[in-house]
Amino acid sequence: MKKEKAVVVFSGGQDSTTCLFWAIQQFEEVEAVTFNYNQRHKLEIDCAVEIAKELGIKHTILDMSLLNQLAPNALTRTDMEITHEEGELPSTFVDGRNLLFLSFAAVLAKQVGARHIVTGVCETDFSGYPDCRDVFVKSLNVTLNLSMDYPFVIHTPLMWIDKAETWKLSDELGAFEFVREKTLTCYNGIIGDGCGECPACQLRKAGLDTYLQEREGASN
């Protein structure tokens, strides 16, 4: 364990909660930051608050509602359908979201004396989001270091693993049941296994089913 402090970009979903448990094992002190950008389901923020409280993690919520003014999308607007047409970005993509989130997380991290930032972005299950790519994160890391003259390190524990491997990681961290029962991934705002129909739920379930099959096979 590093005797240092980390800030986790935290939404209360499967990926960021797995990253939170990862950070707790990696760093002596961990804080979480959640962004309120008027997302479709306010339950996401409530979920993040409850998880942080249960784990005894200091938790900051930042108002990023300006994102909805700049880039209306299906994650913030109930009148927009969740779609993903071939050759186009998904309607759930929010222009500049991870750029802004990581930048503000870095400002917060510096203020609280942390140089490590942890985020659950992932290129393996790449959903067409350009701001989930490794090259983007590495580029932004350099930019943030230059902009604040501060040695930030952005950690992406999930970058090269798929959803099944993310479930495996949560199991290795002793957090499998916690993540399965208490996180919110569903675009329709249903905690745990979700609605089973939206793209996020389908990806989560496919990964879970694959991992459970692998785990069962390994135990036989």
UniProtKB/Swiss-Prot annotation:
Its biological purpose: Catalyzes the ATP-dependent conversion of 7-carboxy-7-deazaguanine (CDG) to 7-cyano-7-deazaguanine (preQ(0)).
InterPro entries: QueC, Rossmann-like_a/b/a_fold
Pathway as given in its UniProt record: Purine metabolism; 7-cyano-7-deazaguanine biosynthesis
Record field: catalytic activity: 7-carboxy-7-deazaguanine + NH4(+) + ATP = 7-cyano-7-deazaguanine + ADP + phosphate + H2O + H(+)
EC number(s) given by UniProt: 6.3.4.20
Name by which UniProt lists this protein: 7-cyano-7-deazaguanine synthase
Note describing how the cofactor binds: Binds 1 zinc ion per subunit.
Molecular function terms from GO: ATP binding; ligase activity, forming carbon-nitrogen bonds; zinc ion binding
Keywords, sorted A to Z: ATP-binding, Ligase, Metal-binding, Nucleotide-binding, Queuosine biosynthesis, Zinc
GO terms of biological process kind: queuosine biosynthetic process
Homology family: Belongs to the QueC family.
Cofactor(s) recorded in Swiss-Prot or TrEMBL: Zn(2+)
Listed CDD domains: QueC-like (cd01995)
Annotated source species: Bacillus mycoides (strain KBAB4)
Gene name linked to the record: queC
Signal sequence residues: none
Oligomeric and partner information: Homodimer.
Enzyme class at the top of the EC tree: ligase
